[in-house]
Each structure stands twice: as C-alpha cells, then as structure tokens.
Design a protein with these regions (language model features):
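Conserved phosphate- and dinucleotide-binding cores of soluble alpha/beta proteins
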Residues: 2-26, 30-34, 45, 115, ...
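Short, Lys/Arg- and Gly-enriched loop/turn segments at beta-strand edges
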Residues: 106-107, 222
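HTH-adjacent hinge/linker in prokaryotic transcriptional regulators
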Residues: 2-23, 27-101, 107-126, 131-133, ...
C-alpha cells in the first residue's frame, strides 16, 4: 500500500468515526504502531486532523478535505455512477459540471466516450467551474470546454465568486450534473462551501435538467450551504437504493432515481 493511499484511508476513518486511537488505525490498515504515529503526525502538520493523546480526531463537521484526499473514497461507486450519468448524454449535448471527485469521474468517462467522439459525432460541450476538469478534457478533440470565470479554491480547484454567474448568464445547457456533499428532503442539495453552492446553483438555473450524482453516503444528510431544493432536482444517480425514509422524500419531491451498483 502506498503512503498516499494509506493517508487517504486514515482520513476516511477519522472522518467516519470522529475520533480514532492508534490501535484502531493499525488494526484497520494492518500497519505498525510506528507507521500510524508517523501518518497521524504528518496529517496533523498538514492541518487535516487534530492529534490527540493516543490517536487523532476530526477537525469538525464544517471542515473540507482537499480534493486530492477525497479521490480514493467510494471510488468504485463513483465510477459506476459516472458511467450511468454518461449514458444520459447524447452527441451534441451541452453539460454543466461542478467540481468534485464524482463529477471529475463523470468528466473522465465523457472524455473517453467513443459514442460521443467517434466518426462524425458532434461531440459534447462541457461547461465547468472546475479547473482540474477543464485541464483534463482540454486534450479531447470531441470535447468543447467552456470555463467560467471566478477565483479558484485550493481545496477543490473550483472557481467561485460573481464571475461564475456572469459567465453562465447567457448560456443554456441540456444537463447540469452536480456533485454534492448532502441530499435531504428538508435542505435539498447541499455542499460545505457557500461559494461552491452558489456556483452550482447558477449551473442548475441554466439547465433543462438537473442531475445529482452522489454515492449513497451523501443521502439523508445535509451540510453547510444549500444549492437547491430537492424539488428542483430532476434525477439522482447513486450506487445503492436509498433508505426508506430518504426514498420517500425523493418520491414526494418527484425525483427520479437511477441506481448504478458498483
């Protein structure tokens, strides 16, 4: 196991449990106590967790991990979701993508799609505020990239601020594919940063259809900043059926659900 993979797993454990001991991390990862101590100290130095006596704790519910530490989480689920989302895209479509690990995977699938890029296919237009998505797709001949204005956030590579809205004002897209940090009946689609929520909200406003791409860990939870009400979401693509209460909320809001098992 590489160090980066191990650090990702440590952060995932801390995020899920809130507080972990050195012994718990060692047992979960199958590594020595000395290795766990080094990893926890390194992550604490990077201000990604708080070191405690005999372990570590999460920084708080409002803290957002940088994108590079999220990539390994639910990776198989995100790949399955991305493939299902890509099936919704027809040649010639315009698609808005916000930032995040799930939408980045959607971008990769669209970028390698033979159905969209083969022969005389008209390709696809991607409108995004995510610098990593724009960079990755810029070499794809069948993809036209439109990047919004804005100020980049280091944690997510997303552009935020009033220039996002002004960039989108005169556009119209077939789909807005949104990655979220939470989806619930009461608060709708949410994310941890208000600037990213605003950018995603503007994307949804210029879309004929709003698609939320989210693994099952995001369902039934809410985070700091609201993107839109649940009723404004047309389709949810996820990896597992929602729990009964959440499924009822989705049905009441008229949200179509596509389950793409990993």
């Amino acid at each position: 196991m590489t160090q980066q993979r191990r650090l990702n797993l440590v952060l995932e454990l801390v995020s899920e449990r809130g507080t972990v001991s050195i012994a718990e991390v060692g047992d979960a990862l199958g590594v020595s106590t000395a290795t766990v101590r080094r990893d926890l100290n390194l992550l604490a130095e990077q201000r990604l967790l708080t070191r405690t006596h005999g372990g570590a704790s999460a920084l708080g519910s409002g803290y957002e991990l940088p994108l590079q530490y999220k990539i390994a989480r639910q990776s198989e689920a995100k790949t399955a979701i991305a493939r299902a989302v890509a099936e919704l895209v027809a040649p010639g479509d315009a698609v808005a993508l916000n930032g995040g690990t799930t939408t980045s995977e959607v971008a990769r699938v669209l970028g390698s799609s033979e159905a969209l890029g083969g022969g005389d296919a008209p390709g696809v237009t991607i409108v995004t505020n995510a610098l990593n998505i724009a960079f990755e797709l810029s070499v794809r001949e069948h993809v036209k990239i439109v990047v919004t204005g804005g100020v980049p956030r280091r944690q997510s590579y997303e552009l935020v601020g009033p220039l996002v809205a002004s960039s989108l004002r005169d556009l119209s897209v077939d789909l807005a594919v949104l990655g979220v940090d939470g989806l619930s009946g009461r608060f709708g689609a949410t994310t941890v940063h208000e600037g990213e929520a605003e950018a995603s909200r503007h994307m949804a406003a210029v879309a004929r259809r709003v698609v939320v791409a989210a693994d099952s860990t995001k369902l039934g939870r809410s985070t700091f900043a609201r993107i839109c009400a649940l009723e404004e979401v047309d389709l949810l693509v996820t990896d597992r059926p929602a729990e009964e209460a959440v499924a009822a909320e989705l049905a009441a809001a008229g949200v179509e659900v596509v389950v793409a098992p990993a």
